[in-house]
């Protein structure tokens, strides 16, 4: 979306959901996480790499699950094709604040709550519950 201000078209490799939605970019962000982990995170470099890689990879997958746009350039720079998942339950978000504050925007927010945020919160809750002691849920003999 920022590219629009610089005259980069939506469908361009550097346009919306282009190179920044590729596995190559996810790997690059993993490497960035590896590099900055000792400076900003209490975790190891491996944790920094994993967080960077998974954050971008999950974003690619979620954008491929939307019902609009041109798809994601998941295999850029090797393949310029834009891809969608076969199953696309997430409503595509309108551009701009005015669009987000409309009836359609509310529908999008409810769709994202259902398909993105609720599952994320469930995973976080499970990690917090089981994280410190994975055996907690198993009764002792």
Label the model's feature ranges:
Residues 1-141:
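N-terminal membrane-targeting hydrophobic helices
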């Amino acid at each position: 979306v920022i590219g629009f201000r610089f005259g980069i078209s939506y469908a361009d490799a550097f346009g919306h959901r282009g190179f920044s939605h590729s596995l190559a970019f996810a790997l690059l962000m993993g490497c960035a996480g590896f590099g900055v982990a000792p400076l900003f995170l209490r975790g190891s470099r491996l944790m920094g790499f994993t967080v960077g890689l998974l954050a971008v990879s999950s974003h690619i997958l979620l954008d491929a699950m939307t019902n609009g746009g041109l798809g994601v350039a998941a295999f850029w720079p090797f393949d310029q094709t834009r891809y969608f998942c076969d199953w696309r339950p997430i409503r595509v978000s309108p551009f701009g604040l005015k669009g987000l504050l409309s009836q359609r925007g509310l529908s999008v927010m409810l769709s994202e709550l259902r398909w993105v945020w609720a599952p994320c919160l469930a995973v976080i809750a499970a990690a917090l519950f089981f994280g410190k002691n994975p055996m907690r849920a198993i009764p002792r003999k």
